């Protein structure tokens, strides 16, 4: 019942607008700060590795192995991906364009930071991200999704609205 209300009601779309813009602002400003002030992820990754050792490690062994074997050797990629990812997730959420994709990729980053031992505001951002994701297209009803999603359905999937055209014999 709540999920249906979240996905179809215009009042919930208004509430989601406020939540979406707040979360988008947090993402966009974090990304913008990294883009304009310079960003090097290697110190963060080394700190994550340090948290994966010791008597009571904060970071799980498997995540530490991922950081050591993949993320740290590819720090140059992450130096671009993290700031641009944060900025674009924020922009998508604020504009309400490709909202569920933006929320999904925001959640991916939140969990990566969380697995790395960074608590800060990740739990509240994760909760908000899941609410937006659960709302589906209604999260972007008061935003670009209202026009972009029907356009994508029509042009990419050859569908108008919810009806599929059936092939003729």
Which residues fall in each region the model found?
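Extended, low-polarity transmembrane helix blocks
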Residues: 1-88, 95-169
């Amino acid at each position: 019942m709540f999920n249906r209300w979240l996905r179809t009601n215009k009042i919930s779309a208004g509430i989601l607008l406020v939540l979406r813009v707040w979360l988008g602002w947090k993402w966009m400003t974090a990304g913008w700060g990294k883009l304009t002030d310079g960003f090097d992820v290697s110190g963060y990754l080394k700190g994550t590795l340090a948290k994966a050792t010791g008597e009571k490690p904060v970071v799980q062994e498997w995540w530490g192995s991922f950081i050591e074997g993949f993320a740290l050797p590819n720090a140059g990629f992450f130096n671009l991906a993290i700031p641009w990812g944060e900025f674009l997730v924020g922009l998508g959420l604020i504009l309400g364009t490709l909202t569920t994709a933006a929320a999904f990729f925001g959640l991916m980053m939140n969990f990566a930071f969380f697995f790395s031992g960074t608590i800060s505001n990740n739990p509240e951002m994760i909760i908000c991200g899941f609410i937006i994701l659960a709302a589906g297209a209604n999260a972007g009803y008061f935003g670009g999704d209202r026009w972009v999603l029907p356009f994508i359905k029509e042009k990419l999937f050859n569908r108008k609205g919810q009806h599929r055209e059936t092939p003729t014999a």
